[in-house]
């Protein structure tokens, strides 16, 4: 297990912004989809790529193109280079980009004392080992008038000479969700990879759309409620990593065959014999394995009186093209546009003989209910479900999704040899992505105490064997 990461040597820290004059100074309001993220930790991710060249080649041949393409990308994804502005209450926070002044911090670093292969491995590693290759988001600036200005994003690219490169990102989630972040990364990747080619021959992703923020109307003071909670906390406190002790992170992959075995079992056991999706059955299996791990370690595991206790899982449904406004929110909308849904299953069902079926049925029912309902009408009740989730034992949520295509990020070096969603370590999250080998499997990231990780691994392997027979 990787126990410690020697801090990389900082080669350069600079500021990257859109080309001057290409984006006018712009203010964007926060929507009721953005407001819940005001008080939550940063969203951090790492992409590892094989790279056999020297530091000199990296600095001369790769970094300049990476910087230039990032600048062009920020011309279209400019809020990432801007600030989150937090005025004194009662004025609401908003996003602002100031042409010629705002930028994101871009760090170039070198690591010569850490084994790249161990760092990107799937095996358990202390959660702190990845923090050295994460960028440091600058602290907020507070004006004499008490207006707080928070940077939104920072990037860091670290070379491990002769072995690989890591591109790290840290951002406040209030500006946009994973759909937007994936869009941003793929646009940047496409520009970087196409360097030197005729622009007319380069196929780039569609441009993001910012203009429809004003049409996202709050259906019932949803955003106001989140603002009140944000103000009641210490809004001057800048969200950052608080590293729990004795925690490790590990990656597990379910192959296509293993997933198909799970799907067949669930379909056979289901009363209506309905087929189940890869996402649902994988999530059900991992959630059950995680809850079994946590309950097994709990002092209350033998208590019969808590058999009717309910465990909760938070899922998210993308509301793009689903909200009943005059016009739909387009798929390329820049911002947060996710509706939270709470899946609830009783303890005795989630730990019983047909636990995966119970979890799968509950997840499927919740998704169908959300997709068939008027999401705007249900929005005022989302907070009730989230509060119930927060107050429960072992609240679990999801980060990422296989459909985001997070391994489809070729900067001219080939696809990533590993991707990590780092912020799952802040508690209770399961990271999901497509498997990196392109076999239609699913990759899962988990953060737990070392002892619990061993238990989780054992329970997971037992489950895989059970459903293989």
Curated annotation (Swiss-Prot):
EC number: 2.3.1.-
Chain positions with N-acetylmethionine modification: 1
The keyword Amino-acid biosynthesis belongs to this UniProt entry's keyword annotation: no
Keywords: Acetylation, Acyltransferase, Transferase
Coiled-coil ranges per UniProt: none
Induction / repression: Up-regulated by high sucrose and by low phosphate stresses.
Phenotype when the gene is knocked out: No visible phenotype, probably due to the redundancy with 3AT2.
Gene Ontology MF terms: acyltransferase activity, transferring groups other than amino-acyl groups
Tissues expressing the protein: Highly expressed in flowers, leaves and roots. Lower levels of expression in stems and siliques.
InterPro entries per the UniProt record, alphabetical: CAT-like_dom_sf, Plant_metabolite_acyltrans
Catalytic residues as annotated in Swiss-Prot or TrEMBL: 173, 410
Biological role: Involved in the acylation of the 6'' position of the 3-O-glucose residue of anthocyanin. Also able to use flavonol 3-glucosides as the acyl acceptor.
PANTHER family in UniProt: PTHR31625
Family listed: Belongs to the plant acyltransferase family.
Name of the protein: Coumaroyl-CoA:anthocyanidin 3-O-glucoside-6''-O-coumaroyltransferase 1
Taxonomic path: Eukaryota, Viridiplantae, Streptophyta, Embryophyta, Tracheophyta
